Structure formats: structure tokens, C-alpha cells
Design a protein with these regions (language model features):
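Walker A (P-loop) phosphate-binding loop of ABC-type ATPase nucleotide-binding domains
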Residues: 46-50
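Conserved ABC transporter NBD signature motif
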Residues: 67-78, 82-83
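Conserved catalytic motifs of ABC-family nucleotide-binding domains
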Residues: 161
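Catalytic Walker B motif of ABC-type/P-loop ATPase nucleotide-binding domains
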Residues: 165-168
Length: 174
């Protein structure tokens, strides 16, 4: 549901009210009100419409100018770290370390999210198989096709078994 402010509720996994983000004089998000229930949801719009800015804002990666919201019950203005621990995020941009093997890239993502090393390695093997990269897991990411890089980013997002998965331009470059 997009549009029309509503009070925060337990039935929504993502909810914003009057969310505003400005970069200097540029208005990137203009009083965004949305409420998303569990399930699959897509966010569509032209280039420059603010989709990535909205995703980074609800993840607590960039600060709001005004307004507020909650993701999985956590305040987006003050609890970004807690939100990111519960969410798998597959960014649009290149975020992989080129010379690192896929297995170590995914393991490293798990460790950054608080997993111990042995659990992260075990889970990295599982998610790389899940995304179809079992046989390529010991290859350097720099040798991967764009599709394989996207699959590696997805594995990084899934490593910690998140409650919610957010993919920004998951088919970018495919």
C-alpha cells in the first residue's frame, strides 16, 4: 500500500510515514508513505525516481531528512544495525572483492553480520549451492560473469537466513 499516512502497525513488515530525504536542495524522497505486508513486493519506477534511496533509507544506511518508519518492528532512524541483522540486502552496485573466491566472499559477509567463522563457512557452502554456484565457489569473483556476480551477491544476502530479503536491481546487467 503506497500513499496515505497510517499509524504504525504490527501487520506491516515495512512501514513509513511522511518519509523525506533531501540531498542539499534536491528532493529524493517526498513524503513517502508506504505499508508492506509479508510476501513478495516489487518497487517499480524510472531511473532517478528514488527507489534505491528508499531502500537504503529503510535499511538505515542513509539518514532521513524527516519522517519515520519501521522495518520488522525496528525504527529506521535509530535501529539501522538491528534492521540490517535481520535483512538480507543485495545491492545494485558492485560490492564484491574481485580477487576473493566466492566462498570466502560469502563467508566474510556472514562474519560481518555476526556469524562465527565456522558457521559462516558451513552456511556459505549451503547458500552458494542454493544459488547455483557450488562448482564455482573456489573461483575468484573477478572471473565471474555478471549473472554469477549477481548470484554471489544473493548468496551474501542469504548467508544469515534473513527474515526479509531486499534486492536492489537484482537483474541489473543480465
Amino acid at each position: 500500500r503506497i500513499g496515505g499516512a497510517r499509524p504504525m502497525s504490527e501487520e506491516w513488515i515495512v512501514e513509513t510515514h511522511d518519509l523525506v530525504k533531501k540531498y542539499g536542495e534536491h528532493l529524493a524522497l517526498d513524503s513517502v508513505n508506504l505499508a508492506i505486508r509479508p510476501g513478495a513486493t516489487g518497487l517499480l519506477g524510472p531511473n532517478g525516481a528514488g527507489k534505491s534511496t528508499l531502500l537504503k533509507t529503510i535499511l538505515g544506511l542513509i539518514a532521513l531528512t524527516s519522517g519515520g518508519g519501521k522495518v520488522l518492528g525496528h525504527d529506521i532512524a535509530t535501529e539501522g544495525a538491528k534492521i540490517r541483522q535481520r535483512i538480507g540486502y543485495m545491492p545494485e552496485y558492485d560490492c564484491l572483492i574481485p580477487d576473493m573466491e566466492a566462498i570466502h566472499q560469502v563467508r566474510y559477509s556472514g562474519e560481518l553480520l555476526g556469524m562465527n567463522s565456522s558457521s559462516a563457512v558451513q552456511r556459505a557452502h549451503e547458500v552458494l549451492e542454493y544459488v547455483g554456484l557450488r562448482d564455482q565457489r573456489y573461483r575468484a569473483v573477478s572471473t565471474f560473469s555478471t549473472g554469477m556476480e549477481q548470484a554471489t551477491k544473493l548468496a551474501c544476502a542469504l548467508i544469515h537466513d534473513p527474515d526479509l530479503l531486499i534486492c536492489d536491481e537484482p537483474t541489473n546487467g543480465l
